[in-house]
Every structure is written in structure tokens, then in C-alpha cells.
Amino acid sequence: MTMKTRPSEEFIDLLKRSGSSDKMVAIAAQREIAKALELPLRKGVLFGDIVTGIFESMPLEPGAAPEFPLDLLAPGTENEHIAYTNPGHGRIPERHVEGDYVMVNTYGVTSSIDFLLKYAREANWNVLARAMQVLEGSFVKKINDDGWHTLLAAAVDRNILVYDADAAAGQFTKRLISLMRTVMRRNGGGNSVTAPGRMSDLYCSPEAIEDIRNWGIDQLDEISRREVYQSSDEGAPLTRIFGCNLHDIFEIGDGQEYQDYFINDLGGSLQTSDVELVVGVDQVNTDSFVMPVKQQVQVFEDEALHRAQRQGYYGWAEIGFGVLDNRRILAGSF
């Protein structure tokens, strides 16, 4: 439901009835509106945020425990699982392995919104549309924060920080990307065949993306610079370097929310004189970032508001976040 597109006449009539002075009529109409808005809101919450591109959503059956098996190969032992030369007779060596599991706790996420009953009675549908946008935005913000707090905690726990020692403070360089790619491969476990780590995506601030536009001839040749100058914000020259996808998010940057959480709440640190954080993730191996969903978003009408001449809706969901292998995430600074 958008603020600029007029809904159908049936919905307008339903909206008018939801503002009726007859409480029974109003509540019945509000219940229909809540169910009509539930599916669009659910889609917006699941696909309108910046973490579902990283975490794999896993809907669970009612009563199912959010347990996830860990890899049979313990971190750092991949090279020990090798085959043997058989001389032609004799017993083949046995190797016994037993996998462990981790349980990712889920929790409830709730939000609500309400507005004056007269807006519904007068069929002021743009107010309802804006109210639903605010309700959706509250869920999205909460999911973003919880998901990124989990990612940043895993990055701090890994205790590896990559930086370009030759770059000026606050300068985002392609060498930093190259160094992070190398560190991710060398410290990601495995070998050329078994579970190799590779940094596929890098999350940075909008200022870092703008730094690319200001790279000089020591960073880019003239042809590449021209492509950068002419590209849009989503253009490949700005968003893909060395096969690594670049994503700019507002919450990362000097003095921004996620960077402050990384430093002040988690005790992480940047290299001396560096001012911004970047986060690299390996999304080629989909074995680490999980998002169990026990309950999809549900929306209900708030019957108690009719006495105050207001109309409102509330909703809840039950989700969780987990990083099963922190070798799939890497922090850097510039």
C-alpha cells in the first residue's frame, strides 16, 4: 500500500467502516484490514532490510528446536582429512568423526502503530499507508540492528583486523580490499579443494564509496577513472572490485551507529589513526550465517483504542541470528 496510489473502492469502504462509531462494526473492519496488510508487511520486513542478503532465513516448524549441526571438520583440521596410498592389500584406515551442534535462541520482536479514528472515518487512506510504512520500518530497523550486532560480535571474536599501512588515515584504497581478500583466504580454513574461504562482499560507509570516485592516477588508469566518473551509484565500477561486491550502509562510518557499537560496546578497535570500519564476509560458503524464523510477522487490530477514539495495529514475530563459523567474517579499517 503506497501513499500516492489510491486503493480500490472496496478498501475505501472498508476503511470508512473501520472508523464507525459502532464498535462492533469498527472492530470487524479493522480485523479485515489487519489481515489484508499482514502479507505486504511480512514481505517488506523480510526483504526490505540489509541483513537478509547475508543471513539465510530458515523458517521452522512449530515446536522445532533451532539446532544447527556444525561442520564435521573442526576449524584448522581440514588438511588432516586426506586419502591414503593403498599398496593393494591390507585394511583401509578408519577415521571416526562426530559432529556437534549449536542452538540459536529465538526471541520475540514486537511493534505497534495507531492514529486518530477520524482519519479512517473520513477515508484518509494516505494516513493508513504512512502508518503501515512506519510499522514496517520499526521491524526492519530492529532486524537490521540485531543482525549486524551479531555480525560485529563475530568479527570482534575472530580478533583479526586488516589495514593498509601505506595509506593515509581515512583513505579507502584498493590495496585494503586486496589485503582483506588475501587474509580471508589464508585464514578461512581449508585448501584449494576443501572449504576455501573467499571474501565475496564488503560492507563500508558511503564515504568509502565516494573515495573511489576520487582515486588518482596512482590508484586507477585513465580508462577506469572515466568509467568511475560516468557510473551511477549502483554502477559496477563503484560496487565491484576484484570480484568483491561493495555495499555502502549508513550505519557504518566515523561516529555512526554500528561502528560505535563495534568500538564502545564490543571493545573492538581500529588501527591507530584509522577512522572507519569495513566488514568483509564470505557469502560463497553458505554454512555460517543463519536466521531461524519461528514465527512470521503477524498483524492484529487493537480493540482497546476505540474508547480513546483511535485506531491501531500491532504485530509480532519470533526470529534469531547466529554465526556458526566466524572465519566467514573479517574486519578492516582505513
Regions found by a protein language model. Name each.
Residues 4-5, 12, 215-334:
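Sequence/fold signature of self-assembling virion shell proteins
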Residues 115-192, 333:
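Alpha-helical scaffold segments that mediate packing/assembly in large oligomeric complexes
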Residues 36-109:
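Assembly/oligomerization interface modules of large self-assembling protein complexes
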Residues 156-234:
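Extended, solvent-exposed, turn-rich assembly/linker loops in the middle of proteins
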Residues 117, 206-208, 317:
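Short, flexible loop/turn elements at secondary-structure junctions
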Residues 106-118:
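Residues forming anionic-ligand binding surfaces in small-molecule and nucleic-acid pockets
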Residues 1-35, 333:
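Intrinsically disordered, low-complexity terminal tails
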Residues 111, 195-200, 309-311:
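Structural beta-strand/beta-sheet cores of well-ordered domains, especially the beta-sheet scaffolds
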